[in-house]
Amino acid sequence: MTEWSVWPAPAKINLFLHVLGRRADGYHELQTAFQLLGYGDRIWLRPRVDGRVERCSHLPGVAAEDDLTVRAARALQAATGSAGGVDIHVDKRLPAGGGVGGGSSDAATVLVALNHLWQTGLDEEALAGIGLALGADVPVFVRGRSAWGEGVGEQLRPMPVDPAGSRWYLVVDPGASISTAEVFGAPELTRDTSPITIPDLRAGAVRNDCEPVVRSRWPAVAEALEWLGRHGQARMSGTGSCCFVGFPGEAEAQAALERLPGAWSGFVAQAVERSPLHLTLAEAARTG
């Protein structure tokens, strides 16, 4: 029987999120910066020859047919005509629906890894296109670099880690269940922020336009931001519920994590320019 292989599915945080307006198709025009982190879920894959896609792990509240990892594998089959199948096991370490890209990153990892394991030969552009049909955040994980994002977040430009900025992040999940649809549908949401440039980000002239809505409707997020604010400039990632604060070094971030209130969960992770997934892919290609 073919052996299992393990592939990383890294987290992301949104260093800012500006809502520029609403598009004719109902989606919102956004600007954001995706910062990839060196921590995330782990995806175990075992190719099979019968063409079946089987989920071997349980994700509470998500049927196998709706699981993004299963959908990603089947989307790759449909796009390439591959007869390959796969068993999928997800070691879930990122909070579901937390704004750190857990499900999107898992889907991207399945696409990238199976493209290698099944030898389907798609390039990055084609994989990103398949990913976009699964979710707006999937392409940034497929491309595997921290990036400046526009459109609905799918228009990407690689963005280096700021050498003068934070290198380590404490990410906190206060456990709130945020409805992204409710946030973007809120009448009080700011929808007319002016476009900015990367130098504006470096200067700190940024915010998360969704944060005031989430603060007012989900008090747990407001409490987490207040607590993190004691350690630096606290921000919310995406539409939450995860919030974060940056540190220059790992020791400072770990010290703050140790003081985390018991009702919350969190992790410390390093900012990375290149995804751990792509480093794993390069090693797999090198060793055959």
UniProtKB/Swiss-Prot annotation:
Q: Which residues form the signal peptide?
A: none
- What are the catalytic residues? 12, 137
- Name one molecular function that GO assigns to this entry: ATP binding
Which EC class, in a word? Answer: transferase
> In this UniProt entry, which cysteines form S-S bonds?
none
Pathway field of the UniProt record reads: Isoprenoid biosynthesis; isopentenyl diphosphate biosynthesis via DXP pathway; isopentenyl diphosphate from 1-deoxy-D-xylulose 5-phosphate: step 3/6
Q: State where ATP binds.
A: 95-105
The record, for InterPro entries, names:
GHMP_kinase_C_dom, GHMP_kinase_C_sf, GHMP_kinase_N_dom, IspE, Ribosomal_Su5_D2-typ_SF, Ribsml_uS5_D2-typ_fold_subgr
Which Pfam families does this UniProt record tie to the protein?
GHMP_kinases_C (PF08544), GHMP_kinases_N (PF00288)
Question: For this protein, what is the EC number?
Answer: 2.7.1.148
Free-text function comment from the UniProt entry = Catalyzes the phosphorylation of the position 2 hydroxy group of 4-diphosphocytidyl-2C-methyl-D-erythritol.
The record's similarity note reads:
Belongs to the GHMP kinase family. IspE subfamily.
Q: What is this protein called?
A: 4-diphosphocytidyl-2-C-methyl-D-erythritol kinase
Which organism is this protein's natural source? Answer: Halorhodospira halophila (strain DSM 244 / SL1) (Ectothiorhodospira halophila (strain DSM 244 / SL1))
This protein's gene is called ispE
